[in-house]
């Protein structure tokens, strides 16, 4: 049972170097890891040889008749034991050094990932829907579609939709970020009435659809310990994004992916139990320290939100097909909502450390004239399972190996609400509620039924 990164280090380190280059990282660390590993393996052979000699002498002592011979054998056994113990200390230090280096490495980039270092280089692989395009955004729309060789049908409109932030706070008057900033700081919000109902309806819609597909519904812990967090993310990259509970070994979760990945921590899973498909629902908490001044208005990029997350434990030979399943599940949800989108293959330099490959689903935002990310789906292969010690047991020979883990957004409620506010906005400011959500609202007397009406009409 060998972790893939350690296997490639020994069998084909050039693959690891190439993967590092694709991410824009220095590949020389691979040479250092290989040097330490070779030194460890050489010393391991010495230790094993000494152990063997010690065992042989121990048996000779048991059968020795001559006292002098027995004394000499005992002295030699003691010398070998002392030598072995000293070498084992060096061996342990080398093993720890090798582990430190290898655990700092990102996952191996899959061959199908395009090489690039900016999200503007992400490669669209398909489009869906008929977006409404404001005349003033037509050139920008074509640059995001035709540049990549796609001819996407669209509806040209002469009125510019109001942006989601202004729709929320001034047209519908169902949100208040200024007061939330006084109470909690920037990127927090108060939502009211119909928008809250819409938030809940989106969550119910996602878990309803996914549980019908056989995904097990999970309400996970909203906090996790450091050792689990270290197993699921690159802490060096994300330390400024995660909220820590003061004086406690606990962190607020940034996504349900993290506690779901810990569900089988330090466990073995029989082959015939896989794949294990989960759908988690939780609040998410993110510092967004690296966001700077991006998306300061509204609820697109915030410190807390609700999310439904897909998570799968899979056999290695099935994980790539399951990645396609996860993104298709998300696409079906957004098709049901009627939100026009594109799926992009994320370039190597924009992958997070755990991901070997990632798809983003981006919805067209008519007021912004851009496709914006709503969903990320990743195959982390054995990057997380090695750290969390989660193994599968093959039925035929009881061989152990590390499972593959995969994750994908199903619905992030606040972002999806921003897309609804812009895409289903009428000229007067009315927001039509997607039909698939209405059955989750109609049972509540106070919930909106088919539309959210403006307090302040925009036009007409």
Curated annotation (Swiss-Prot):
Pathway entry: Aminoacyl-tRNA biosynthesis; selenocysteinyl-tRNA(Sec) biosynthesis; L-seryl-tRNA(Sec) from L-serine and tRNA(Sec): step 1/1
Residues at which L-serine binds: 255-257, 309, 409
Catalytic activity from the UniProt record: tRNA(Ser) + L-serine + ATP = L-seryl-tRNA(Ser) + AMP + diphosphate + H(+); tRNA(Sec) + L-serine + ATP = L-seryl-tRNA(Sec) + AMP + diphosphate + H(+)
PROSITE patterns: AA_TRNA_LIGASE_II
Subcellular location field: Cytoplasm
Keywords: Aminoacyl-tRNA synthetase, ATP-binding, Cytoplasm, Ligase, Nucleotide-binding, Protein biosynthesis
Primary site of residence: cytoplasm
Cellular component, GO annotation: cytoplasm
Documented EC number(s): 6.1.1.11
InterPro entries noted in UniProt: aa-tRNA-synt_IIb, aa-tRNA-synth_II, aa-tRNA-synth_II/BPL/LPL, Ser-tRNA-ligase_type_1, Ser-tRNA-synth_1_N, SerRS_1_N_sf, SerRS_core, tRNA-bd_arm
Chain sites annotated for binding ATP: 286-288, 302, 373-376
Gene Ontology biological process terms from the UniProt entry: selenocysteine biosynthetic process; seryl-tRNA aminoacylation
Known function: Catalyzes the attachment of serine to tRNA(Ser). Is also able to aminoacylate tRNA(Sec) with serine, to form the misacylated tRNA L-seryl-tRNA(Sec), which will be further converted into selenocysteinyl-tRNA(Sec).
UniProt family annotation: Belongs to the class-II aminoacyl-tRNA synthetase family. Type-1 seryl-tRNA synthetase subfamily.
UniProt note: domains: Consists of two distinct domains, a catalytic core and a N-terminal extension that is involved in tRNA binding.
Assembly with partners or alone: Homodimer. The tRNA molecule binds across the dimer.
The protein, known as: Serine--tRNA ligase
Organism: Hyperthermus butylicus (strain DSM 5456 / JCM 9403 / PLM1-5)
